[in-house]
């Protein structure tokens, strides 16, 4: 849950003055960051894959490439550090069509409706968004499976047409006709135990045998090294 990022700075560094260094681990899994001052008053900074529960066995002739770390320095405070890092990421890491485009201003229905929505109140939100000259409506959690609360349905990525009072395509068309783009929420890395997917593939959940699993928002984490990755990708395409 923590951002794999650290800053080392002089105690007097501010947003606009002073020296600071940052290390941004370009990896989304478990990580370990450590700073140590030795007997010569030199600071040693380490950041990488968390070695507590990680191991990787290499066979003869194989290799393992560790994730990269982006190192940044500023002599003009934290703001300059942030700007330099942002520019580096935009120029070298972002690969999608959004790399050099201004992001759309959007409205997300979640805080307005949570799970309790239908086509009519989604269209009402979209109309207000269009009147305010926003760019996009994003349909959040609850559009799929049996998903009226956070105890069930996550992982069943098929459209709940009863809830939407029709097909997803029909809803999207109405939103597009207002001049808005349409976005759809996914949480592909999680699963509800009360779901068709879990009942079919309980082994896809990331749990330690013989131990009580850790749940967050009544959900388990999927083991993305399994076929669930292909399943979720196919389901997203179908939706």
Where are these regions (language model features)?
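N-terminal accessory beta-strand-rich subdomains and adjacent acidic, glycine-rich linkers
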Residues: 1-89
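Intrinsic disorder/low-complexity signal
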Residues: 9, 139, 236-237
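A generic structural signal for short, solvent-exposed coil/turn residues
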Residues: 15, 25, 37-41, 48-50, ...
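Hydrophobic positions within alpha-helical membrane elements
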Residues: 66-67, 145, 239
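Long, charged amphipathic helices and adjacent flexible linkers at domain junctions
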Residues: 89-98
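Aromatic-lined carbohydrate-binding/catalytic grooves of carbohydrate-active enzymes
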Residues: 100-230
């Amino acid at each position: 849950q923590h951002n794999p990022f650290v800053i080392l700075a002089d105690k007097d560094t501010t947003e606009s003055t002073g020296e600071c260094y940052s290390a941004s681990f370009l990896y989304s899994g478990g990580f370990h960051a450590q700073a140590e001052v030795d007997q010569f008053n030199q600071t040693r900074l380490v950041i990488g894959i968390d070695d507590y529960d990680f191991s990787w066995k290499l066979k003869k002739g194989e290799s393992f490439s560790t994730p990269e770390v982006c190192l940044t320095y500023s002599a003009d405070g934290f703001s300059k550090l942030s700007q330099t890092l942002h520019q580096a990421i935009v120029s070298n890491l972002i690969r999608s069509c959004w790399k050099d485009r201004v992001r759309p201003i959007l409205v997300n229905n979640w805080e307005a409706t949570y799970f309790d929505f239908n086509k009519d109140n989604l269209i009402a939100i979209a109309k207000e968004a269009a009147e305010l000259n926003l760019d996009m409506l994003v349909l959040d959690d609850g559009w799929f499976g049996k998903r009226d609360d956070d105890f069930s349905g996550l992982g069943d990525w098929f459209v709940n047409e009863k809830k939407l009072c029709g097909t997803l395509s029909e809803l999207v068309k109405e939103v597009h006709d207002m001049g808005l783009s349409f976005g759809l929420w996914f949480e592909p890395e999680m699963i509800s135990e009360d779901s068709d997917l879990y009942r079919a593939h309980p082994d896809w959940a990331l749990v330690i045998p013989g131990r009580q699993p850790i749940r967050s928002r009544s959900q388990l984490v999927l083991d993305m090294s399994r076929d669930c990755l292909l399943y979720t990708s196919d389901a997203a395409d179908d939706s």
